């Protein structure tokens, strides 16, 4: 586990798990969901659960993963089996460089792709900049999809500010606490519930719930969230991540949560729904890299000076992490 700090905020990055960000802290505030669970036992420390999804979930303890070169369902591409959410997030990376407030890691994948990620804390500011690039080391065009998977620890009742846009609720049943209607559509912030009413997704509910929605074809790449007395934000490269997965797991009873999780995940993504790379190739949503080609993307996390009560007055968050 590697630590970075600029004197204002600090982060912890697990170089042995694809550069997963385990913590983003400012003073006593921890902005990411971070679970120190002894169970369920991780598949890597025991044996497989017989499912790529369950194996991935057995390792999950919150935090911020990168999904690459697959996101969503396990599938097979070019004869290569790709696990749920891609193998990068469960891969031991190489540390290219490490400074007090900057870290560079890289690793290859099952496909002939290499992903390099740079984490930089802006001097004297509560801003984390993530830059990444993927290169094709083969002599053939190679497809991929990617996404960011940050799970935030937003308290119940917190407000979420996002640009308006279309929503699709995932068609699958998430669990007994799902309150959104599977397969329904809406416009941010409202979607149909299961009994003929409407649900406002811009407020983290007080009740236990489970939700997965796709805020597809985003008009702008940013979100602002109330976290106690603070306002946090995330902005992203809209060309790399034109869609957003919106996932909430609050008090869910199933594996691996068992009622212990409180997660609101705002996930910039290159595809929707979460069908995986094989489906993205068929639907035309996959990116392709030519031999030797490199593609880059950025994501920024920041903490605002805007008062929590004024969160809905925010009009945008730019690539530098500045709120407007």
Where are these regions (language model features)?
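Surface-exposed acidic/polar loop and edge beta-strand patches at domain peripheries
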Residues: 1-129, 140-145, 150-324
């Amino acid at each position: 586990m590697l630590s970075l700090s600029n004197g204002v905020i600090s982060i912890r990055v697990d170089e042995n798990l694809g550069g997963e960000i385990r913590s983003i802290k400012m003073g006593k505030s921890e902005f990411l969901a971070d679970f120190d669970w002894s169970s369920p036992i991780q598949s890597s420390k025991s044996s497989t659960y017989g499912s790529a999804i369950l194996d991935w979930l057995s390792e999950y303890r919150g935090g911020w993963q990168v999904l690459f070169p697959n996101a969503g369902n396990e599938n097979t591409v070019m004869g290569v089996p790709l696990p749920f959410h891609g193998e990068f997030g469960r891969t031991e990376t190489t540390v290219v460089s490490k400074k007090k407030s900057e870290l560079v890691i890289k690793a290859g994948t099952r496909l002939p792709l290499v992903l390099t990620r740079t984490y930089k804390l802006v001097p004297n500011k509560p801003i984390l900049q993530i830059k990444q690039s993927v290169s094709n080391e083969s002599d053939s065009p190679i497809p991929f999809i990617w996404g960011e998977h940050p799970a935030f620890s937003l308290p119940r009742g917190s407000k979420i500010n996002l640009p308006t846009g279309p929503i699709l609720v995932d068609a699958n049943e998430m669990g007994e606490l799902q309150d959104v209607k599977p397969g329904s559509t809406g416009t941010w912030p409202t979607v149909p519930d299961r009994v003929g009413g409407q649900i406002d997704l811009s407020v983290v509910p007080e009740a236990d719930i489970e939700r997965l929605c796709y805020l597809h074809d985003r008009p702008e790449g940013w979100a602002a969230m109330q976290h106690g007395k603070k306002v946090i934000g995330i902005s992203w490269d809209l060309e790399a991540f034109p869609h957003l997965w919106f996932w909430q797991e609050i008090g869910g009873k199933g594996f691996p949560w068992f009622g212990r999780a409180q997660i609101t995940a705002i996930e910039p993504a290159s595809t929707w729904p979460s069908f995986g790379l094989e489906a993205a190739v068929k639907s035309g949503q996959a990116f392709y890299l030519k031999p030797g080609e490199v593609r880059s993307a950025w994501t920024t996390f920041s903490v605002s000076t805007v008062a929590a009560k004024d969160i809905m007055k925010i009009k945008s968050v730019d690539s530098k992490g500045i709120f407007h």
